[in-house]
């Protein structure tokens, strides 16, 4: 089964907790703080594996979690950091944030890596909080939570050449003749339900990868038939061989079909019309094909949009014209840069950071309880060691520094009111 779109959940490892500990040795009465820091949690990394061709491995596994860092230890020893969780994906995988739809990365090169979730840093042990005013602090931090994100992985087949055309025009037959690929072939629509890849090797040592893009129909750009699933793969090719049936055995007019597919390309992505396109009239071994070809060529040359397109008629059965077509395709590929691909429209080329002056929290009164929410305050709370009073006092100072106390007073909170952050409930003190 060819799988080209999946949704997964990834969770990076949490940082290990720092600890409160003191040096206790004979003849060292004032050993001081000795609590070590926690180790860093593992990142979640996507890596291109040249041996993969589909996203099939994700069909039954959708959740991935990296290991957390180890807790700090006595004698100022830092906990062990965890290794990254590396997930293999095929080349041509586009990674999107499922919540925002933003493209996080485009993985095309063998061995290319992308960190999709960063592991949390280790919490600090009490030795980090020692100061002249507080030489023996009982303060430590829990590890920072690792990032968690829902992702959509979308595979776009990487090929130099794409075979384009209506169903049953002979794309699979051509692929089987010029390469060692063995696609399913039959005289009915949508025999090809997945992109098939093959390698074309010329006698002069040149080679290129060719993809049999499943047949398109009118309305494909709106998802009619199997349109969306197929059109995404066209974007990755550098040259399109547009196959047109010259057998005269169908009711459709060859030029009308040719024009319809170009209209679907335009609707799906106008930049696809700038892709180099070679017209390949097929089934030239059948009676009446020569007359159909003459009529078709005349219509093409009369349309200024297609007048400059090269035409290479072939027969995959008799092999007539195949050698010229393959050689010309290789020549055209040499004229087009390797990186001449359509960029994903919303892909970020640089990492940007947004700074906002708005509050990092919200406060809402629910059933006489002041509920505080916000990514920053919740993260600070998770990193607070609630088993030590000094750590709780430090968290209270952080809340005041963020303006939460002032906001509670402004909203009408009174002494003794219940305040909740996540599952932790405490009293508001004036």
UniProtKB/Swiss-Prot annotation:
CDD domains: Obg (cd01898). GTP binds at residues 165-172, 190-194, 212-215, 282-285, 315-317. Its cofactor is Mg(2+). Residues 122-143 are annotated as: Disordered. Mg(2+) binds at residues 172, 192. It is an enzyme of class 3 (hydrolase). InterPro entries: G_OBG, GTP-bd, GTP-bd_Obg/CgtA, GTP-bd_prot_GTP1/OBG_C_sf, GTP1-OBG_CS, GTP1_OBG_dom, GTP1_OBG_dom_sf, OBG_GTPase. Its EC number is 3.6.5.-. Residues 1-158 form the Obg domain. Residues 353-430 form the OCT domain. Residues 159-334 form the OBG-type G domain. GO terms for biological process: ribosome biogenesis. GO terms for molecular function: GTP binding; GTPase activity; magnesium ion binding. It is found in: Cytoplasm. One of its GO terms (cellular component) is cytoplasm. Keywords: Cytoplasm, GTP-binding, Hydrolase, Magnesium, Metal-binding, Nucleotide-binding. Belongs to the TRAFAC class OBG-HflX-like GTPase superfamily. OBG GTPase family. Monomer. An essential GTPase which binds GTP, GDP and possibly (p)ppGpp with moderate affinity, with high nucleotide exchange rates and a fairly low GTP hydrolysis rate. Plays a role in control of the cell cycle, stress response, ribosome biogenesis and in those bacteria that undergo differentiation, in morphogenesis control. HAMAP family: GTPase_Obg. This is GTPase Obg. It comes from Pediococcus pentosaceus (strain ATCC 25745 / CCUG 21536 / LMG 10740 / 183-1w).
């Amino acid at each position: 089964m060819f799988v080209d779109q999946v949704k997964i959940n990834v969770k990076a490892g949490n940082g290990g907790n720092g600890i409160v500990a003191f040096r206790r040795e004979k003849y060292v009465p004032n050993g001081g703080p000795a609590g070590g820091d926690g180790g860093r949690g593992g990142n979640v990394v996507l890596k291109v594996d040249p041996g993969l061709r589909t996203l099939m491995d994700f069909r039954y596994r959708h959740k991935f979690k990296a290991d957390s860092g180890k807790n700090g230890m006595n004698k100022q020893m830092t906990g062990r950091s965890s290794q990254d969780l590396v997930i293999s994906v095929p080349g041509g995988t586009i990674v999107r944030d499922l919540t925002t739809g933003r493209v996080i990365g485009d993985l095309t090169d063998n061995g290319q890596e992308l960190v999709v979730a960063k592991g949390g840093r280790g919490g600090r042990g009490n030795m980090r909080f020692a100061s002249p005013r507080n030489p023996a602090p009982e303060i430590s931090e829990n590890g920072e939570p690792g990032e968690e994100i829902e992702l959509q992985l979308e595979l776009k087949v990487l090929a130099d050449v794409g075979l384009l055309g209506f169903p049953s025009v002979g794309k699979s037959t051509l692929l089987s003749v010029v390469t060692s690929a063995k696609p399913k072939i039959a005289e009915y629509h949508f025999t090809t339900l997945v992109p098939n890849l093959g390698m074309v090797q010329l006698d002069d040592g040149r080679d290129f990868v060719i993809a049999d893009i499943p047949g398109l129909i009118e309305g494909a750009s709106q998802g009619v038939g199997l349109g969306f699933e197929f059109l995404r793969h066209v974007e990755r090719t550098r040259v399109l061989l547009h196959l047109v049936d010259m057998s005269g055995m169908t009711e459709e007019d060859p030029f009308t079909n040719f024009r319809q597919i170009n209209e679907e390309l335009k609707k799906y992505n106008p930049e696809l019309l700038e892709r180099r396109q070679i017209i390949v009239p097929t089934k030239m071994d059948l009676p009446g094909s020569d007359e159909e070809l003459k009529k078709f060529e005349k219509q093409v040359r009369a349309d200024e949009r297609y007048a400059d397109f090269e035409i290479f008629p072939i027969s995959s059965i008799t092999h007539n014209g195949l050698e010229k077509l393959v050689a010309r395709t290789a020549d055209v590929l040499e004229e087009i840069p390797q990186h001449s691909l359509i960029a994903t429209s919303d892909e970020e080329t640089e990492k940007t950071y947004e700074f906002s002056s708005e509050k990092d929290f919200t406060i809402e009164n629910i059933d006489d309880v002041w509920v505080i929410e916000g990514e920053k305050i919740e993260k600070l709370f998770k990193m607070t060691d609630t088993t030590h009073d000094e750590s709780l006092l430090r968290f209270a100072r952080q809340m005041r520094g963020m303006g939460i106390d002032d906001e509670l007073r402004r909203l009408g909170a009174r002494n003794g009111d219940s305040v909740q952050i996540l599952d932790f409930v405490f009293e508001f003190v004036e």
